[in-house]
């Protein structure tokens, strides 16, 4: 499915780096096992999963592993793990984001650390990626809380464009464990081919995005991407195996793993 880079390590390895982020604090019980293989953690803020105690415990794990601490806000929808779209007013969207980040910031202040980034979760992430006005509200809300916070968003999406438009630092995200559609969006989870389960296939997809700035979609279309951070979902059934293999593969290619 992807170009093979096994024989071209020296050719492409100079000066490249990538962040590896993972969604955490969601009750999957694998956070401690994943931490050594990532550089950024997106921690659930209580609306789709988690609570103040899990936020604190996950922040502690991140600090122990020198991993960047990020807030992972979502729709208020624990029943569906934040994975169903909701139609809400823009003022409600601003409050939704503000309430979750403010809680997270209160905890980081208590623990003597700072929020490095925000990454939206699930349906909220996908909805904003496709909608300029929602993305603008999200970026403005984050900037009003702390202009030094970065926004992680889908590469090439409205989330990135609207953050850049107001001067909020954005980090373009790609995915190690998901397939793509020709429009640059992730394949919906209800489709059988949405998840990548083979660690080697996942690593090859990431290499294609980092080394070639492109990805082959499920229908064979090649699309351009800008890979600044790559996501591994903590609730993926093969998350630990994918993370370990990707970490080792990037090291073999001398691609530095570091937070933005």
Write out the residue ranges for each language-model feature:
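C-terminal domain-boundary segment and adjacent tail
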Residues: 149, 241-260
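Active-site rim beta-loop-alpha module in soluble metabolic enzymes
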Residues: 156-162, 166-214
């Amino acid at each position: 499915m992807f170009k093979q880079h096994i024989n071209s390590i020296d050719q492409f390895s100079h000066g490249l780096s990538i962040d590896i982020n993972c969604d955490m604090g969601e009750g999957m019980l694998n956070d401690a096992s994943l931490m050594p293989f990532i550089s950024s953690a997106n921690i659930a803020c209580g609306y789709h999963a988690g609570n103040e105690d899990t936020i604190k415990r996950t922040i502690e794990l991140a600090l122990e592993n020198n991993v960047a601490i990020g807030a992972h806000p979502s729709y208020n929808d624990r029943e569906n793990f934040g994975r169903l779209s909701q139609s809400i007013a823009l003022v409600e969207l601003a409050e939704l984001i503000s309430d979750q980040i403010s809680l997270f910031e209160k905890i980081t202040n208590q623990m003597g650390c700072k929020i490095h980034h925000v990454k939206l979760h699930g349906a909220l992430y996908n909805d904003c990626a496709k909608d300029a006005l929602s993305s603008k509200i999200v970026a403005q809300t984050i900037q009003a809380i702390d202009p030094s916070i970065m926004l992680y968003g889908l590469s090439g999406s409205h989330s990135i464009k609207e953050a850049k438009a107001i001067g909020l630092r954005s980090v373009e995200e790609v995915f190690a464990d998901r397939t793509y559609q020709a429009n640059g969006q992730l394949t919906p989870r209800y489709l059988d081919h949405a998840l990548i389960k083979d660690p080697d296939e996942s690593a090859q997809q990431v290499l294609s995005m980092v080394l070639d700035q492109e990805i082959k979609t499920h229908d064979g279309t090649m699309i351009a991407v800008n890979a600044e951070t790559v996501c591994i979902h903590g609730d993926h059934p093969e998350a630990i195996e994918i993370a370990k293999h990707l970490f080792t593969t990037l090291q073999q290619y001398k691609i530095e793993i570091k937070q933005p």
